[in-house]
Every structure is written in structure tokens, then in C-alpha cells.
Amino acid sequence: MRVAAATAAAGAGPAMAVWTRATKAGLVELLLRERWVRVVAELSGESLSLTGDAAAAELEPALGPAAAAFNGLPNGGGAGDSLPGSPSRGLGPPSPPAPPRGPAGEAGASPPVRRVRVVKQEAGGLGISIKGGRENRMPILISKIFPGLAADQSRALRLGDAILSVNGTDLRQATHDQAVQALKRAGKEVLLEVKFIREVTPYIKKPSLVSDLPWEGAAPQSPSFSGSEDSGSPKHQNSTKDRKIIPLKMCFAARNLSMPDLENRLIELHSPDSRNTLILRCKDTATAHSWFVAIHTNIMALLPQVLAELNAMLGATSTAGGSKEVKHIAWLAEQAKLDGGRQQWRPVLMAVTEKDLLLYDCMPWTRDAWASPCHSYPLVATRLVHSGSGCRSPSLGSDLTFATRTGSRQGIEMHLFRVETHRDLSSWTRILVQGCHAAAELIKEVSLGCMLNGQEVRLTIHYENGFTISRENGGSSSILYRYPFERLKMSADDGIRNLYLDFGGPEGELTMDLHSCPKPIVFVLHTFLSAKVTRMGLLV
């Protein structure tokens, strides 16, 4: 792995670390349409390019015995056999539809022999490509149907059809060349006798990175094909590579998130819009770790650019004094509780501004999207309650997690998050702690009405001056109690509506009815105290 120059943008803020960008290239496997296919992966500073490898076929399991046994059988064989090697779970498009059932409708019935009449066009011939032949111990199979040509217009042929005869000439024992010549000499009107073979369809329909790998914003580079009946000849191959370029900006690289990885060989790359997931498999654990670190490093190196774009977008359209600078934004995983008590990690995008902690399910590239987070929590009422290792492994060690608690009118809201690296954990820990303290200094004070000893009063907590309890008298107010923070001996709440404060004064413990859940003000008080202690150098 080669490392490029440092790339962190100047002025990105103290929360942003200096990152270097990695370059890397090598062979990996890609889960594409429920199959593992070999691709050449090339990592640059801003993108990951995947190129279909010509040797990918070597990774594919050999066709099952059903296809070979077809030769010589009057009606074809093995329709009910299955192919080995298919993964139990895939993220690509579904497999081709099942062939028509037999007359009785049984799922295992052998597909019928069909007779199809095709009229050749002046240019393009039948418009099919074929594979197989006696020398390959395979039937003659339709491997490609070219859009708009004769076979396609007939609407009666499909990929995976075995050609049994052409104008009455039996092709069950034909070699590939014999089949090609029979199709070429067939004249303008061609009567084909065909039968669908389900087992070979996944292998005939070779996955294409361009068409089968959905990814918003990816740049495709697609091969073009000739319209000949003989797809096996080198003269019909086009040198253009089947290639997909994945922009890394605001992608989420993860391990052991959406797919089990018992061998620690998988890497997951989630798109910024959360709609697509790319799964890569490496040859061993060490290689997977190396690739993951490189991809993750480059994604993180792009964050200063993302922050600059976000702040420019928000600042350009906000009203005077209403802008909230985005301090940090990145993907991580949040623990979600499912029915039956089960738990699951799911991707979540967390952003920290001057005053708020925001959670999104996709990257908010527009101001409207930014204004609609899934959750929004004031930093001054939020605290970090855990940061460290868990019990399971996202890559080579235990889970790295941190938890937040926020005081709200509904009580305490808790979130457990998982990060992928120790550097991420340290970064988020620092950002949240410093962000909460900075929010306390920025907000300065909170004030709310409440009941004390049966009368309406106002409780004000000021970051510098401490506590003030006052009573409104017409247009003026009178101060009942004023205490600095160091006079607070005890604070508590009942979790419902009452806040208890004891300053050691002659009035004793004050019971304040807040008319709603006291947790928000309790958490603000904790943040003020924590920020002041840290500022005094008593807590690092």
C-alpha cells in the first residue's frame, strides 16, 4: 500500500485530524447477483474502481452434471439439479425468473420443448450468441440475445435455452462450429427447437459491473458487443473493460455489519444515500484488514472537503446569526432493538454542530435534507457515558463502542454507537466531550418557570454565575435565592416533574415543580459543571 501526501484541509477546525490518502490495487472478489466474481480493485484518493477480471471464470464452479448429461437425452436432463457454490445471501438483483411450469403445474416439472420461428433480418442475422458444444460436454446454449434484432423481436427465446435442432437438423451432438454453421446456413426463416435449462442460466448470464452493481453517482465504463451468432470467437470480443468507479466521498466502510463474516475476509461499502451496499471478499484476514484500513483512510481524508461544502451550503442560505457551523460528520453504526429483544447494528450518520447532535439515515446534501434529521439532540443536554471496547469483533478485535445519554421531556434517551477503528473512537470521544463543553459556554444560561412552595418562580442557571431563583412581580422581578455552583451540596430529581436542590442554606432543600420531566435541566446542570471543572484544569 502506497501512501500519498497529507490532505487535511487548513481551517477544518481542531476536531479534524490530519489524514493521508492511500493508494492500493489488487484482486478481490465482489458479491454480484448472488455470486462471487473476481475483480481488479484500484484505490485512489477519491474513488475505488472495480474492473471485471478476465480470469474471473476460473473462480466460478464448473457447470453441474445436469448440463453435461443433457447431450444425447431426447428431452434434456437434470432440470431439478442445483448448482454448488452459490452464496446464501446476496445484495445484487434477483436471479432470472423461473421457467414455465409443466402442464400439471408442479414446481419440479421439466420445461417443455418449444418450437420457435424466427425471421432473420437483413443485418444482424438471428441476433443471438451461443456457447457450448459436444467438445465442451454441453448443449448448444443461447448465451446472449441482442436487443432489437430478430431473436429479441420474436419474444419467444430466452437466455439458457438449449437449441435442439435448426430447421430439422439435430444439434444435440453438434460441436460448437457445427452449430454456428447450421445457424448461418438456415436461410431467412429459421425454425428452432429449444428447451430451457434452468441450471446454466446464472453462468450464461455473466454479471456486469455496469448493469448489475447499482450505485448512485458511480461512473460506468461498459463493454460493447458484436451481434454475431458466435460469441466464442476472439474476433468478437471488445477490449473495453467492464468497469465501475465508486466515489468514496461520504461512503461508509464497515466490517461485520450487514453480512456475517466468520472468516474476517469481508469489507462492506455503503453508499452515501444508504440505498446500496457493496461487499468485497479478500483472500485472507490480513489482506481484508489492509484493504479496509486503506479505504477507510481515504474516506476520512475527504471529510474536510465535505465539511467545507456543508458549511458553505448552510452559511450561504442561513439568516444572520442563525448559522450553526458543522464541526464533524461521519458514518458509524447504531445498535437498534428489534422485536423479540434481538439487537442489530445499522448504519447511521452523525453530525455535530456548535449546539446540536444530529442523526441521519442518509447524507443530507441539501438544506432541506439537513433540516430534517431523524433525531436532533442539544449538546448541552447530552453526555458521553461510555467509550471503549465491547465484546464482539468488527475486524480484528472487540467492538469499539461509545454511548450517549440525553435528557428530554420523555426522560433519558440513550444511544449505543459502534465505530470501526480506535482512531475513530478517540475522535468521537473528544468531539462529543469538547462539543458539549463548548455548547455550555456558547449558550451561557437556561431559564424555565416552575413552582416553589406553592408560588410561580423562575429558575435560571448561568454558566458563570450559578443559580438564581426569582419571582415575577408585575413588570419587575425579585430575587429569592442566588447561589454560585460551589454552594450546591446536592441535586436530585424524581424523574417525573420535581427537581431537588440543596445549597446548605437556612431554607434547606428546595423542591421545585418543573411541570414536566426534569431530565433536560438536570443534564444541562451536569454539562455546566463538567465544563467548568474541565476549564479549571481539574479534569482532563
Swiss-Prot record:
Region (Calmodulin-binding), start-end ranges: 518-540
Phosphoserine: residues carrying this PTM: S95, S110, S129, S211, S222, S233, S393, S395
Segments of this protein annotated with the region Disordered: 73-114, 220-240
Listed Low complexity bias regions: 81-92, 103-112, 222-231
PROSITE patterns: PDZ, PH_DOMAIN
Keyword set, alphabetical order: Actin-binding, Calcium, Calmodulin-binding, Cell junction, Cytoplasm, Cytoplasmic vesicle, Cytoskeleton, Membrane, Microtubule, Phosphoprotein, Repeat
Tissue specificity remark: Ubiquitous. Isoform 1 is the predominant isoform. Weak level of isoform 2 is present in all tested tissues, except in liver and heart where it is highly expressed.
Post-translational modification: Phosphorylated. Partially dephosphorylated upon insulin stimulation.
Pro residues: compositionally biased ranges: 93-102
All residue ranges annotated as the PH domain in the record: 163-300, 325-437
Family matches, as Gene3D superfamilies: 2.30.42.10, Pleckstrin-homology domain (PH domain)/Phosphotyrosine-binding domain (PTB)
Localization, UniProt: Membrane; Cytoplasmic vesicle, Secretory vesicle membrane; Cell junction; Cytoplasm, Cytoskeleton
Residues of the SU domain: 484-540
SUPFAM superfamilies (alphabetical): PDZ domain-like, PH domain-like
PDZ domain span: 115-198
Membrane topology reported for the UniProt record: Peripheral membrane protein
TM helices/strands, residue ranges: none
One GO MF term attached to the UniProt entry: actin binding
Domain notes per entry: The PH 1 domain mediates the oligomerization in a calcium dependent manner. The PDZ domain binds to the last three or four amino acids of ion channels and receptor proteins. The association with dystrophin or related proteins probably leaves the PDZ domain available to recruit proteins to the membrane.
PANTHER family: BETA-2-SYNTROPHIN, SYNTROPHIN
Similarity comment: family membership: Belongs to the syntrophin family.
Known function: Adapter protein that binds to and probably organizes the subcellular localization of a variety of membrane proteins. May link various receptors to the actin cytoskeleton and the dystrophin glycoprotein complex. May play a role in the regulation of secretory granules via its interaction with PTPRN.
Assembly description: Monomer and homodimer. Interacts with the other members of the syntrophin family: SNTA1 and SNTB1; and with the sodium channel proteins SCN4A and SCN5A. Interacts with SAST, MAST205, microtubules and microtubule-associated proteins. Interacts with the dystrophin protein DMD and related proteins DTNA and UTRN, and with the neuroregulin receptor ERBB4. Interacts with PTPRN when phosphorylated, protecting PTPRN from protein cleavage by CAPN1. Dephosphorylation upon insulin stimulation disrupts the interaction with PTPRN and results in the cleavage of PTPRN. Interacts with DTNB.
Name of the protein: Beta-2-syntrophin
Organism encoding this protein: Homo sapiens
Organism ancestry: Eukaryota, Metazoa, Chordata, Craniata, Vertebrata
